[in-house]
Amino acid sequence: MKEDMEVLSLASLPVGFRFSPTDEELVRYYLRLKINGHDNDVRVIREIDICKWEPWDLPDFSVVKTTDSEWLFFCPLDRKYPSGSRMNRATVAGYWKATGKDRKIKSGKTKIIGVKRTLVFYTGRAPKGTRTCWIMHEYRATEKDLDGTKSGQNPFVVCKLFKKQDIVNGAAEPEESKSCEVEPAVSSPTVVDEVEMSEVSPVFPKTEETNPCDVAESSLVIPSECRSGYSVPEVTTTGLDDIDWLSFMEFDSPKLFSPLHSQVQSELGSSFNGLQSESSELFKNHNEDYIQTQYGTNDADEYMSKFLDSFLDIPYEPEQIPYEPQNLSSCNKINDESKRGIKIRARRAQAPGCAEQFVMQGDASRRLRLQVNLNSHKSETDSTQLQFIKKEVKDTTTETMTKGCGNFTRSKSRTSFIFKKIAAMGCSYRGLFRVGVVAVVCVMSVCSLVA
């Protein structure tokens, strides 16, 4: 008796039955039969060109109607170029982009029968596409008898489409922030109801050593802004009264600062005694004529000191002279004794009203007297030079008149010598007058020679 086999629909199956083949079953059974042309045996998986449809339209073409977000399709290999190996994965709204690396599919433990590649759908165009929640696994056979080039074979791949549930309502994600892991596994978050906080122990242990200046009791409180719940302890100062502050002020010990004479002598020994004797003899001879050193004597310094003392070591004895306005003109008189040196004259007493003015003027009158004194010496020197110049001019004139024009060059040289002497003279009024007289005489002598 012939038994008829009844085909059951998926809707009539009990709950828990579903079409979910493994990776090895997809390649070893379904893909092999499809490549070899046995379409009726694998009609449970529909053939469709993935790149001609958008991913959100593909679930409606699935043969198996399921509530799971997983669908299987056969897809023919659509090469981008006839002679190339790249696949055309672009659609109207976007493109499929491979991510990660290919994973091997094994039969048993060692035999490799295929590879699995993961692709993610992006809307827009590369490289500014936006990642979506649609994921696809592409299963390809790697055995030589399934390359699709033999007679009766057609190149196919199996595509498993997923829709990730963690991206709600197709929320977009930029391509730059994509992840390499695109497995459709959905992770369930772990909810923590209660978090018990343990008591925080201090990091540094308390030290039992106390400072000698510990504080015991006081009403002094240091103000501070503490934003935490910790309150600042009160600072006490009563214990400060028990401290012997005088012990800290004994800093005059020779061990802290300079050593004592006995300490230095004990450390240095005989060398310290020799140094002390030499230093005493050095200061003992400061009143003698000179001091002998390893570099010579100080004779030159002694001579210079005596020379300066002859001018500066003059006793100053001010005279108390009553203030007389008519005697102010007498301060310009020159003392005859000043010719041998500089003598500081006594300062006359000033009137009470002129005391402030005298302080402001300082020693201006003294400087004037010194200047007059110097001019007086200069005038005497100029008189001697003037007599010599007159004699030279007279001799030159006589010689020029006697010898005539032949000796004009010689007279010219003598005249230049005369002008040099004139330039060496001082610039006093009497000297200028005498120079003018000499110049007139010279001009007259030259004119007579020219005539």
UniProtKB/Swiss-Prot annotation:
Effect of gene knockout: Increased replication of turnip crinkle virus (TCV) and cucumber mosaic virus (CMV). Normal HRT-mediated hypersensitive response (HR) and resistance to TCV. Delayed flower development in antisense asTIP plants.
UniProt-annotated location(s): Nucleus; Endomembrane system
Gene induction: Induced by bacterial pathogens type III effector proteins (TTEs).
Residue ranges, annotated region (Involved in Transcription activation): 1-268
GO molecular function list: DNA binding; DNA-binding transcription factor activity; transcription cis-regulatory region binding; transcription coactivator activity
Location of the region described as Turnip crinkle virus (TCV) capsid protein- (CP-) binding in the Swiss-Prot/TrEMBL record: 351-451
UniProt-listed InterPro entries: NAC-dom (IPR003441), NAC_dom_sf (IPR036093)
Residue span(s) of domain NAC: 13-164
UniProt membrane topology term: Single-pass membrane protein
Ranges that cross the membrane: 431-450
UniProt DNA-binding residue ranges: 113-170
Comment field on protein domains: The NAC domain includes a DNA binding domain and a dimerization domain.
SUBUNIT field: (Microbial infection) Interacts via its C-terminal region with the N-terminal region of the turnip crinkle virus (TCV) capsid protein (CP); this interaction prevents its nuclear localization and inhibits its function in basal resistance response pathway.
Family annotation (PANTHER family): NAC TRANSCRIPTION FACTOR, PROTEIN CUP-SHAPED COTYLEDON 2-RELATED
Name the record gives this protein: NAC domain-containing protein 91
Lineage: Eukaryota, Viridiplantae, Streptophyta, Embryophyta, Tracheophyta
